[in-house]
């Protein structure tokens, strides 16, 4: 995937108030009545909302080429909203809309365009509130409390459809083939696109498009659709509609990274931190019955128990998966945290990462080379750092304006309390020692049966026979709690250097400074040495500044925790792989990848772990991804990034090279 090379739409508004693309010399919607044209062509052409009452599944999936102003989406959402309000007991409960856009509108242009349709304002305002930054890849928006999911894929549709995971094959119930006219934008209307639409269309799925161009009709027929001409809208004589009347078959492209869903709709989660809490809500939203087993007597006693944690992305130019995953995870996390109906201490004050020596300065230069939008990350000079943060460091760096800090312990407790009101059953003080396969499900401690199980228990995730070989490791660390002083109180942003320092929490007038890093260590005993080390690192990184001397650790106030990490700094999200079967089945994978079967996994056993030091950033999208996978729903990441999150990845990479797995 070409990361972040996204240009915003170059448009103007004509005398009628219709947006017009300067680059394509074409209107975004009809000057006459764009709203009625959308209802006629795309909703009517796909027999929507007539199909809503008889839809056989809880989720309807609609895909579109060319999001533009979002008119098609908003019109469909309005119709869906009216339908579910009037028909609360039908099977169809949720809408998933997937759209591709090469040139996304700027937020202000989107708002101006929406003024043309006052009747869509209730839905348009929700979209505007979550409108994402313009960088490449998938932006998942959860709207209407999660009843409507919008996946906005920014980039070239002909490239993006090649990067979709196989799990989306034959899932789309209806296609809106939209975009600028074929004569104006021939690069989009390709046989590759038509073939991708056919691959993604569910048998019996439909499509509609405003054009009646012969090459479009023939191309869609060649791809597998049954096509017919219909009367066009208004002055347009004809349009095209189609149906996928056959069942096509498509071989898996990377079967060794295949993700298996679950036929169950009942699951146990083993954990008690932020990952468990977010996953509980994501599954409950999809209609699952969920039970949480926590070994501790209260939530967030592990790595999620800190008073202040920083929210910002891990950026890397060297690893494409990191470069794709973390911006998506960071922006999704902010959207989710902002939408939560719970209270927790937090400040979106920004985070600034400093180049305090030659190595860190070089690293920041590489981060900036990712060319993320400035509202995500941008360069700052030493003078700008002083202005932004309120303290003088003498260092420049990179700032994340949308970052900040939050209280993980509060957030986790509030999320689990919210989940309990939505049906979550919680058992505290219940350590799960063993997992035993029982039919298609699992027995916990030889006692409690569940149809599916998710392991989200931090560094203890390897404590089962099924996970003992996973290449993850614990990292112990101590965070120091220090009282504020007049000079420390001036700090307005989270500072990251060879450690981190938060602004004071107004609720307790304390800062957090940390954290020590002890790979392989699970000891949570207070360490005087770590306390001193946390203070000294701040002083050493900014030797010319006086204010770091104000850090007072004499009260020995600190918290020790244990993170779970991986060598490649990415979480493990997906099926628990079957270690022995993976080594046996893929012994000759490097010689015969073309005949490989799907990845061997432990049926109905999943994991969400190895979040390392960035769990606040990665847990929301990771939980959303796993809940979608378990429910056989569209996934919010491209296939390469999904492969990089697969718990079997480190083994499979070695096997693909013919190397031994140790």
From Swiss-Prot:
GO terms for molecular function: flavin adenine dinucleotide binding; oxidoreductase activity, acting on the CH-NH group of donors; tRNA (5-methylaminomethyl-2-thiouridylate)(34)-methyltransferase activity. InterPro entries: FAD-dep_OxRdtase, FAD/NAD-bd_sf, MnmC-like_methylTransf, SAM-dependent_MTases_sf, tRNA_MAMT_biosynth_bifunc_MnmC, tRNA_MNMC2, tRNA_S-uridine_synth_MnmC_C. The keyword Flavoprotein applies. Its EC number is 2.1.1.61, 1.5.-.-. The keyword tRNA-binding does not apply. One of its GO terms (biological process) is tRNA wobble uridine modification. It catalyses: 5-aminomethyl-2-thiouridine(34) in tRNA + S-adenosyl-L-methionine = 5-methylaminomethyl-2-thiouridine(34) in tRNA + S-adenosyl-L-homocysteine + H(+). It is found in: Cytoplasm. Residues 270-662 are annotated as: FAD-dependent cmnm(5)s(2)U34 oxidoreductase. Its cofactor is FAD. Residues 1-245 are annotated as: tRNA (mnm(5)s(2)U34)-methyltransferase. Keywords: Cytoplasm, FAD, Flavoprotein, Methyltransferase, Multifunctional enzyme, Oxidoreductase, S-adenosyl-L-methionine, Transferase, tRNA processing. Gene3D superfamilies: D-Amino Acid Oxidase, subunit A, domain 2, FAD/NAD(P)-binding domain, Vaccinia Virus protein VP39. GO terms for cellular component: cytoplasm. Catalyzes the last two steps in the biosynthesis of 5-methylaminomethyl-2-thiouridine (mnm(5)s(2)U) at the wobble position (U34) in tRNA. Catalyzes the FAD-dependent demodification of cmnm(5)s(2)U34 to nm(5)s(2)U34, followed by the transfer of a methyl group from S-adenosyl-L-methionine to nm(5)s(2)U34, to form mnm(5)s(2)U34. PANTHER family: SARCOSINE DEHYDROGENASE-RELATED, TRNA 5-METHYLAMINOMETHYL-2-THIOURIDINE BIOSYNTHESIS BIFUNCTIONAL PROTEIN MNMC. In the N-terminal section; belongs to the methyltransferase superfamily. tRNA (mnm(5)s(2)U34)-methyltransferase family. This is tRNA 5-methylaminomethyl-2-thiouridine biosynthesis bifunctional protein MnmC. It comes from Klebsiella pneumoniae subsp. pneumoniae (strain ATCC 700721 / MGH 78578). The gene is mnmC.
